[in-house]
């Protein structure tokens, strides 16, 4: 039972790990990883002014997309790979 609880918590937290552990400021940017670059290359994300076409996210600060959809609030706070 404890193992099941741990696995459930990990599955809930892991998709948002990047949002939790990284600061999303202009002077603290990370480069895009190959996986993130391939998202753009496949056309999953479309970045017109503040919107994501394929997943319907509403963006607050910058064009942003995520392959599996929006975050828990249906709002993307500006993912790091879209600011490069």
UniProtKB/Swiss-Prot annotation:
Free-text comment about domains: The cysteine framework is XII (C-C-C-C-CC-C-C).
Propeptide: 20-42
UniProt subcellular location: Secreted
UniProt main location, coarse: secreted
Recorded family membership: Belongs to the conotoxin O1 superfamily.
GO terms assigned for molecular function: ion channel inhibitor activity; toxin activity
Pfam families linked: Conotoxin
Signal peptide positions (record): 1-19
Tissue-level expression: Expressed by the venom duct.
Residues that bear 4-hydroxyproline: 77
InterPro entries registered for this protein in UniProt: Conotoxin
Keywords: Bromination, Disulfide bond, Hydroxylation, Ion channel impairing toxin, Neurotoxin, Secreted, Signal, Toxin
Domain of life the protein comes from: Eukaryota
Protein name: Mu-conotoxin-like Cal 12.2d
GO cellular component, as recorded: extracellular region
Positions of modified residues (6'-bromotryptophan): 72, 81
PTM summary: Contains 4 disulfide bonds.
Function: Mu-conotoxins block voltage-gated sodium channels. This toxin reversibly blocks voltage-gated sodium channel in cephalopods, with no alteration in the voltage dependence of sodium conductance or on the kinetics of inactivation.
Naturally occurring in which organism (per UniProt): Californiconus californicus
């Amino acid at each position: 039972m404890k193992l099941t609880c741990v696995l459930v918590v990990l599955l809930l937290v892991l998709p948002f790990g990047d949002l939790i552990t990284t600061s999303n400021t202009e002077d603290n940017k990370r480069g895009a990883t190959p996986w993130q670059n391939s998202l753009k290359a496949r056309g999953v994300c479309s970045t017109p002014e503040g919107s994501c076409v394929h997943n319907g996210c509403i963006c607050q600060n910058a064009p942003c997309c995520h392959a599996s959809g929006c975050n828990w609030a249906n709002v993307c706070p500006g993912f790091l790979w879209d600011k490069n």
